[in-house]
């Protein structure tokens, strides 16, 4: 049998493995049939030899390994029981429990583990499958990935994407916290500024602390329900224009919800002590404060200063205004519910009340004195009123010390003639009408609270005794002038007024009602 023919037959049958074997090896000389004894056994032995060579694993130079497709691939025939030969004498079969991947084969696996995602771990492949594809091998691959990244499976589960709603809540919480910090710093600085301003104006610090009110303070003291009921009762008997204004207030009471906690306190001073000067200084400072005037007639006194509004205009404004700092001038003219409602609408963190506690009247829940707020700074020294007026006011139960010059106080009969003054005032509507009938302009004392005039004439009649029982009104009427005060009074009431010996039998307190009955609510102020 010719060996060359046999090789050619193998080539034509496409057996590349035989080609690979004989290209780099020497073909041994096979004895002929005659040399082996003349029988045909040599041919059959040669075929068996070639068959075995065809199925024997191929050895490759330089220790290169052949690549197999998958872990399930097996070499048929003899190779099924023949161990794979690996360079450096490595074993081909390892136990699944303690099998280790050789150094040169671990590098590709580690590189691939860097690209793996914890959420979807990739199945081990490559060298792990080459060494049997056992379960132990896949576990080794997973452990390598976990140890390399330093993240356990439990930590990987917790490291999920945060929902948008949770992120939004977290962002809002951070904003609220930052806003609270900013607000606290602003209030502390403003308190220090108020303290310095009051001391420069010779106001005395009483040692009391600001009252800290909760955001729902309006509801806690039952004032919101009282005010709601009061507004509904007033709407039933009000005119069209007034009804619309009351309706808007009622809507605010029901719509505005608790916003922020706030601090509040009172700066109290006698007439002429410098309260208006303090308010102007605070408004001109570096702090963004808003001032609400309980008496809109004082608007001209604050001309050229930003942030000054009438209390009703600010409360019912169509344009929403917010401010951390709220100052209320002549607070005794404002209703307690209006102040708390204004604080809620402006979201103010501090409400500073400026006025004279002696000019207040705690008879019903509508009075701010009903809240019993602390007086933080006080002054009994007047720089505008002279000694004569200060002595007269002290007899009325309003103690004050004058550091001004001497002024003039003239007391005469109601009927007669006197020098004309800049302003004429009276306690009741009937007296105002009587003065106007004589050709003189006249105003109610309550309407000029907070205003100042160079000279004033005060008209008193016997019919005004009930109005004179109001200590608050007496102080207002006696302290509107700077240099001259003329008192024209009937003989029956003159002496009692000068000595303060007036029937002051006050009515019982009606703090359980927001508004008193008409006959208890100084109806003599208004025209009938």
UniProtKB/Swiss-Prot annotation:
MF term (GO), any: ATP binding
Co-factor(s): Mg(2+)
Control of this protein's activity: ATPase activity is enhanced by the suppressor of RNA silencing Gamma-B.
Record field: catalytic activity: ATP + H2O = ADP + phosphate + H(+)
Basic residues bias spans: 109-119
Alphabetized InterPro entries for the sequence: (+)RNA_virus_helicase_core_dom (IPR027351), AAA+_ATPase (IPR003593), P-loop_NTPase (IPR027417)
GO cellular component, one term: host cell nucleolus
Residue segments, region Nuclear localization signal: 243-254
Biased composition (Basic and acidic residues): 1-13, 516-528
Region span, Disordered: 1-143, 508-528
Region (Interaction with the suppressor of RNA silencing Gamma-B) location: 75-491
Region (2 X 26 AA tandem repeats): 52-103
Location relative to the cell: Host cell junction, Host plasmodesma; Host nucleus; Host cytoplasm; Host nucleus, Host nucleolus
Residue intervals of the (+)RNA virus helicase ATP-binding domain: 236-379
Region: Nucleolar localization signal, residue numbers: 111-120
Domain (+)RNA virus helicase C-terminal: 380-520
EC number: 3.6.4.-
Coiled-coil blocks: none
Pfam families with a match to the protein in the record: Viral_helicase1
Described function: Participates in the transport of viral genome to neighboring plant cells directly through plasmodesmata, without any budding. Multifunctional movement protein with RNA-binding, ATPase and helicase activities. Engages in homologous interactions leading to the formation of a ribonucleoprotein complex containing plus-sense viral RNAs (vRNPs). ATPase activity is probably required for vRNPs movement complex assembly. Intracellular delivery of TGBp1-containing vRNPs to plasmodesmata is facilitated by TGBp2 and TGBp3.
Family label: Belongs to the virgaviridae/benyvirus TGB1 movement protein family.
UniProt name for this protein: Movement protein TGB1
